[in-house]
């Protein structure tokens, strides 16, 4: 069976580009390039929640070692967004399912199930709050250390509804194109492979239009497997009605 690089070589050859395109196989950190510097770096490094699988580390390594001064990176910016959603039916299916599994009580597994983010497509009608940008990474200047962060967010309710989860997605930018291009993986746009990442909350929040949920989003690579992510989301709803006020913090592992 041929590997993808074998097919790539065939494609280069049949298109008469062998004198212009050189293909190398190997890890970026290990491969030896036939030249000292490059003018452009192009990489599709994005994972679920933007940073899952830590592929951006390799792009930053290539940038620091090979990119010429004033060289170009595509894409060159990435922003993570958050929003609150109503998703009671699916939350009950995913979490409440463990209360009765063919007549048996599996409820001890609920605590584990809620720590696992769900990668799925979210209907725009389920989105209750305005989107909130949390972090923007500039690939010309960011470092590996910047990929672990603890940052505030604030979500403003568009309508009165319940909030069962928060979701995250990302936008990327190609600012150096002749006409700048922006590409989104949010619920407001067409389906993409990355979908959205759903984080179910322990509480069900009851919000009125105009109220805000504030909190902290923390992300860092898992210590045992740096391609996995340890994510923490705190939340606080200060409602006009004290009976609706709620706060908490949930831990998630993306693996």
Regions found by a protein language model. Give the residues of each.
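Class I SAM-binding transferase module
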Residues: 1-218, 222-255
């Amino acid at each position: 069976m041929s590997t993808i690089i074998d097919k790539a070589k065939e494609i280069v050859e049949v298109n008469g580009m062998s004198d212009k395109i050189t293909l190398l196989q190997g890890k970026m950190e290990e491969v030896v390039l036939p030249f000292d510097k490059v003018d452009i770096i192009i990489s599709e490094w994005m994972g679920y929640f933007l940073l899952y699988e830590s592929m951006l580390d390799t792009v930053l390594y290539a940038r620091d070692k090979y990119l010429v001064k004033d060289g170009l990176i595509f894409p060159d910016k990435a922003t993570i967004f958050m929003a609150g959603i109503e998703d009671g039916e699916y939350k009950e299916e995913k979490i409440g399912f463990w209360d009765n599994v063919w007549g048996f009580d599996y409820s001890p597994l609920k605590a584990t199930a809620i720590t696992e983010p769900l990668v799925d497509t979210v209907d725009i009608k389920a989105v209750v709050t305005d989107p909130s940008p949390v972090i923007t990474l500039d690939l010309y200047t960011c470092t590996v250390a910047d990929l672990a962060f603890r940052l505030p967010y604030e979500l403003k309710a568009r309508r009165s509804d319940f909030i069962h989860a928060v979701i995250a997605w990302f936008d990327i930018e190609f600012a150096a194109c002749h006409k700048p291009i922006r590409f989104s993986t949010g619920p407001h746009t067409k389906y993409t492979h990355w979908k959205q990442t759903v984080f179910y909350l322990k509480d069900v929040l009851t919000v009125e239009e105009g109220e805000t949920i504030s909190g902290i989003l923390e992300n860092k690579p898992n210590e045992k497997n740096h391609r996995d992510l340890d994510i923490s989301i705190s939340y606080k709803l200060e409602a006009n009605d004290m009976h609706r006020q709620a706060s908490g913090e949930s831990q998630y592992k993306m693996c």
